[in-house]
Amino acid sequence: MSDILRRGRLASVPDEEIINFTSSMNADKWIFKADILVDLAHTIMLKERKIIKAEDCKKILEGLLTIKEEGIEKLDHTYEDIHISLESRLIDMVGEDTGGRMHSGRSRNDEVATCIRLTLRNDLLLLMEELIALRNTLNDTSSENLNTLMPGFTHLQHAQPTTLAHHLTAHANAIGRDLERTMDCYKRVNLSPLGAAAFASTGFDLDRERTCKLLGFDGLIENSMDAVSSRDFLIESASVFANLMINLSKVAEEIVIWSTSEFAFIELDDRYASTSSIMPQKKNPDTAELLRGKSGVTIGSLMSLLAICKALPLSYNRDLQEATPNIMQSLETTRASVRIMNGMIATMSINKENMAGLATAGFTTATELADTMVRVCDIPFRTAHQIVGVLARGSGEPTLGEIDAVAHNVIGESLSSRGLTEKMVKEALDPILNVSKRSVIGGPSPESMERLIESSRERIANNTEILESLIANRDNAIESLFCEVEKCIDV
């Protein structure tokens, strides 16, 4: 191996342990395709600015296209990073007098920052698509369960009757915010550092705006020092992923709980379950458990990124090499988790009978009974709260006579004397009527849920339109880049 970097300044060759310690080749596989694009755009710009000759540009571009077709497997993995390995392969193909000109006016510092942003950009767009698919699945399942009664929980204790639609749209709303955070994060990722060189830009007459356009970036990171040293876009992305995974972990936790015999609200499709090596009857929700655990991985990746970037002096430091594996792991885990969650929800069986049967367990209708007392009997809510609280010590199905007896002890008179009837009590204890009365914006009534789901679908349509525009902008830019490549080669 002839190292095109070390042969000048450095006299000795590192041993295998040092090479393995300092190499980023494994993580750099993630940015291989982006590195080719960056090289193509930079080379075209060099030719346009007359920094390299047209014939050298042609040979370099042809070599890069060959390397692209050969794939990363053909590169020498003993080099310390993908950039030097790729450039060395190019020089082997076209000679140093030609291939050695490609890196004019450029550093690995701005090169790697550009590659990471390009690759992350693509994955963010894919994540947006996957989040939209998940939100659609949640909305569809909610629409099918507008009248599916279930207990609502606080502190994991039965609280009030609600519906499965109400419960799932809460998760859908959270996923919607995750989608919007991802879209907002994209704006700061899709900026070009290319042309910043090591940190002080270059004396070559580069056109940074030209490479920015060729690669489909929305703009430049203008300060060259900031361009090569900033990794806050990785921290922001990892924060978005961690927040998303926390939201998914909540759903995963409920899937695990709801799959138990004690709840038996749902049953996962067999594809998302496993069995025991000793207990043949077991059907374990392993996929949901793993997703729940993987949320911790993304939190760990975020913490690692924060620690790596902490207190680094300007401008570039090699510490930043350790950031790439962490964002890769976080991103891959998050995207896989979104797809898995979508599949679990789309294919799970819902036990509506069990859900409805437990909708009133634990006196979940107590709040509506207290509200009825306030509306009918004109007593303060705190007084009604006390009366119903005493009744909660009983069966959870109080009669008018039992209510009057407690009321006598609390306020010195019966509530029936204030207009409360047995029919009103029964209606207050009816979980279906409980839900139907809660028709305020965001409440669990079927009418309210229909409005919320329709509003959610309108937002998804808007998000989809924005996403399609982002994808089109990227695709058009890359298509134009390859058109420019063909023009340079065909001259």
From Swiss-Prot:
Q: Which InterPro entries match?
A: Arg_succ_lyase_C (IPR029419), Argininosuccinate_lyase (IPR009049), Fumarase/histidase_N (IPR024083), Fumarate_lyase_fam (IPR000362), Fumarate_lyase_N (IPR022761), L-Aspartase-like (IPR008948)
Q: Which residues form the signal peptide?
A: none
Its EC number(s): 4.3.2.1
Compartments it resides in: Cytoplasm
Query: What family does the entry list?
Result: Belongs to the lyase 1 family. Argininosuccinate lyase subfamily.
Q: Which UniProt keywords apply?
A: Amino-acid biosynthesis, Arginine biosynthesis, Cytoplasm, Lyase
What is the predominant subcellular site recorded for this chain? cytoplasm
Q: GO molecular-function annotation terms?
A: argininosuccinate lyase activity
The top EC class, named as a word, is lyase
Give, as in the UniProt entry, the pathway in which the protein acts: Amino-acid biosynthesis; L-arginine biosynthesis; L-arginine from L-ornithine and carbamoyl phosphate: step 3/3
Annotated catalysed reactions: 2-(N(omega)-L-arginino)succinate = fumarate + L-arginine
GO cellular component assignments: cytosol
* GO biological process per UniProt: arginine biosynthetic process via ornithine; L-arginine biosynthetic process
Entry keyword Cell inner membrane? no
Q: What is this protein called?
A: Argininosuccinate lyase
| PANTHER family registered for this protein in UniProt | ARGININOSUCCINATE LYASE
Indicate whether Cytoplasm appears among the record's keywords.
yes
